[in-house]
Amino acid sequence: MAELNFSLRLPRNGALPFTIADRTRRVYDTVSSVYPASTFFFHSKAHDLALRHSGIRDGMRVLEIATGSGEMFRRLVQVNPSGTTFGLDLSPNMAARTQFHARRKFPAAAAHCGAVDARQMPFPDASFHAAMCCYLFELLCEEDIRRTLREVHRVLRPGATFSLVLIGQNVEFFNRAYAVAGSLVPAFWGRQVEQSVPEMVAEAGLRVERNQFVRQGFYPSRVLVFRKPAR
Ligand SMILES: C[S@@+](CC[C@H](N)C(=O)[O-])C[C@H]1O[C@@H](n2cnc3c(N)ncnc32)[C@H](O)[C@@H]1O
């Protein structure tokens, strides 16, 4: 059996000096069949809010970055039945699960999900009317966050929206618990980046239009919607 050692301690200040993509891929591959429970209990309220304010409607070309087990992806396909919805996730098991359930629930829809690294997306410039990304940036180092944001900017059409969900840093006891979890299994938890990423998105050339905190039980999220300026 393959060795599964996901622990690689983070420095005490919580910095992620480099992205540990191989470990992240393995850990998310391993948990893919149970991950829907986590989405249901901790992410579904923020997913609702992000979708509601995303401006996504039927007939668009929509991209979801880091689909996880596909709960948001199915919502996107549902609101975009005659458009095209693409998804990607680093973990092949997550991507396969997302594709399988979307096809089963919406057999007639153009919905495609593959195992792709968000840091280098295989889409031409200006391909999408909208992109959605929930709880990914916690897992990338700063350089890779910036690189991924450049990719997001590149694949969006002028006037397109970018909806982003981050783990909130506005609940002190949660922050402490997250720092412990992140230092034990960084490939799964990463570290919180909610206070720094919005500025990086702005630096990548997108303008913020909506910014809201939401809490599901003890789990805080921040939902932001950005827009790529029209030419
Ligand atoms: C915390 S989960 C979030 C899943 C889902 N977006 C949600 O809202 O529940 C993070 C996901 O990001 C994926 N991921 C991590 N690094 C990635 C990368 N470089 N490119 C694409 N996906 C990545 C993981 O495989 C995992 O499925």
Where on the chain are the PLM-derived regions?
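Conserved alpha-helix/loop element of class I SAM-dependent methyltransferases that forms part
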Residues: 41-58
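Class I SAM-dependent methyltransferase SAM/SAH-binding core
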Residues: 63-120
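A short acidic, Gly/Pro-enriched loop at the edge of an enzyme's catalytic core
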Residues: 119-131
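A short SAM/SAH-binding and catalytic strip from SAM-dependent methyltransferases
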Residues: 130-143
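A short glycine-rich, Lys/Arg-flanked "PGG" loop and its adjoining helix->strand segment in the class I
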Residues: 146-158
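Conserved beta-strand signature within the Rossmann-like core of class I S-adenosyl-L-methionine
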Residues: 159-166
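Short alpha-helix
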Residues: 189-204
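Core SAM-dependent methyltransferase catalytic element
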Residues: 205-206, 210-231
